[in-house]
Every structure is written in C-alpha cells, then in structure tokens.
C-alpha cells in the first residue's frame, strides 16, 4: 500500500521540481544513492523496473526508506503493463511511471488513488492520458520529441497540464532553466545525475552535492 497520498506525491513533485531515476541490482548501492539524494533535498525518487528481481529490490527499499528516509516518496518506473503495476503497488509504490501510455494501467492505479504518469509524445497522447485520469504525464524522450519548445507549445492549448520530462535533461543551469521556463511540473534525471564512475567509486557526497545544485537551479528558474 502507498504511504503517501496522490495529493502529497504531486505536491512534492511540484515543490522540488526533480525526480531522480535509478536502478541497480545491488540493493546496498540503491540505498546509498537514495540516501545521498535525500540528503541533497530530493523528496521524490523513481526506481526503474529494469533488471531481474527488480521488484524484490524495490520491496526492500520501501521497508528501509520508511525509517532511513521517512519523507522520501518512492515510486516505480519503466512499468508497461497492468500486472507489473499491480505488483509494485502491492509492494508500496507511491506512484507508477511508464515509457508509454497503457490504458490498462490507469484503472489499476486509479482504484487505489495512486498517480500514474505515462510516457507521451504528442498532444493527443497527453490528452488521452489525462482523460484516463493521469494527472501527471511524462514527455519522453523529451529531447527527441522537441525539447522545451514542445512543452511550451503543449501548455498553450492544454494549460491545465502537469508535465514531467525525461531524456536530454541534465543537472546544469543552462539545461534546466529552459525546461522550467517552458512550464514543466518537474524533470526526471538518471545517468547525468548518477554518472557510472561516481556510483562505482561510492562517491555519495558528490551525488548529494549535484542534487543540491540542480534543485537550486530549478528554484532560481522559478523565481
């Protein structure tokens, strides 16, 4: 069961403006990354379903985070079917994210009032997802779809939209500012926030610092 309500999840996404995206088969590495992000000010974290036994790792992380990072909102990403969504919801996912829009996932999440953020690449897909009850839609791959200008042009006719972008998003002021100015609710970041060499070296302090910097750039762009 989800620990946080849909309202709390969306409020945290809006307040911080950033959702780190990560997967590693080593649960201890995952814990260290999540803790580093938490200490850097992150409050929403997407664990991606991208490896064998990923759901088992996620279940362990949810139990651990409840005490180690009590305000961290953990969700599951790379979910493409209703069965997998149900599995992660049972393990405590507070939100579900997918690279595509699957209308079969929406009612599974809606029944439990858990946010479902599907990947969309057009105004039609975004609006169809909204009609299915998706409060936050994800534009992916954001860089290929059209960048900040695409988001800005979507927000013109669909002013009520809450858009998350992933792909071509980097933790730099030059990159983040255009996305925020375009009107996104939040940005998702993976490899740019967690370089392989940083994770391999166990330099968790560097991840904390990078999160702090990115959140600072987002706040500045919103000011």
Residue map of PLM features:
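Conserved N-terminal beta1-alpha1 strand-loop-helix module at the mouth
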Residues: 1-75, 79-83, 87-91, 181, ...
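Hydrophobic faces of well-ordered beta-strands that scaffold small-molecule active sites
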Residues: 17-22, 45-47, 74-77, 96-97, ...
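Active-site beta-loop-alpha junctions enriched in small/polar residues
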Residues: 21-25, 48-52, 77-81, 101, ...
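Glycine-enriched alpha-helix->loop->beta-strand junction motifs that scaffold or abut catalytic
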Residues: 38-43, 89-96, 110-117, 131-136, ...
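Glycine-rich phosphate-binding active-site loops on the catalytic face of alpha/beta enzymes
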Residues: 43, 96-105, 138-147, 183-204
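Glycine/Thr-rich beta-alpha phosphate-binding loop at enzyme active sites
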Residues: 43-52, 84, 89-91, 112, ...
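Helix-adjacent hinge/juxtasegments
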Residues: 73-75, 81-119, 123
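Catalytic cores of alpha/beta
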Residues: 81-91, 124-133, 170-187
């Amino acid at each position: 069961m989800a620990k946080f309500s849909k309202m709390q999840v969306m409020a945290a996404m809006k307040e911080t403006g950033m959702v780190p995206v990560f997967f590693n088969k080593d649960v201890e590495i995952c814990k260290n990354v999540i803790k580093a992000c938490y200490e850097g000010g992150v409050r929403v974290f997407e664990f991606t379903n991208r490896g064998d036994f990923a759901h088992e790792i996620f279940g362990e992380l949810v139990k651990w985070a409840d005490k180690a990072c009590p305000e961290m909102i953990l969700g599951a990403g790379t979910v493409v079917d209703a069965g997998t969504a149900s599995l992660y919801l049972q393990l405590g996912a507070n939100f579900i994210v997918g690279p595509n829009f699957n209308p079969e996932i929406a009612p599974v999440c809606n029944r439990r009032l858990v946010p479902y953020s599907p990947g969309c690449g057009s105004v039609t897909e975004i609006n169809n997802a909204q009609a299915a009850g998706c409060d936050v839609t994800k534009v992916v791959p954001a860089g290929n779809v059209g960048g900040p200008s695409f988001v800005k042009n979507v927000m013109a006719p669909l002013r009520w939209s809450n858009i998350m972008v992933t792909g071509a998003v980097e933790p730099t002021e030059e990159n983040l500012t255009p996305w925020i100015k375009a009107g996104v609710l939040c940005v998702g970041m993976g490899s740019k926030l967690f370089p392989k060499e940083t994770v391999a070296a166990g330099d968790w302090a560097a991840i904390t610092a990078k999160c702090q910097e990115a959140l600072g750039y987002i706040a500045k762009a919103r000011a």
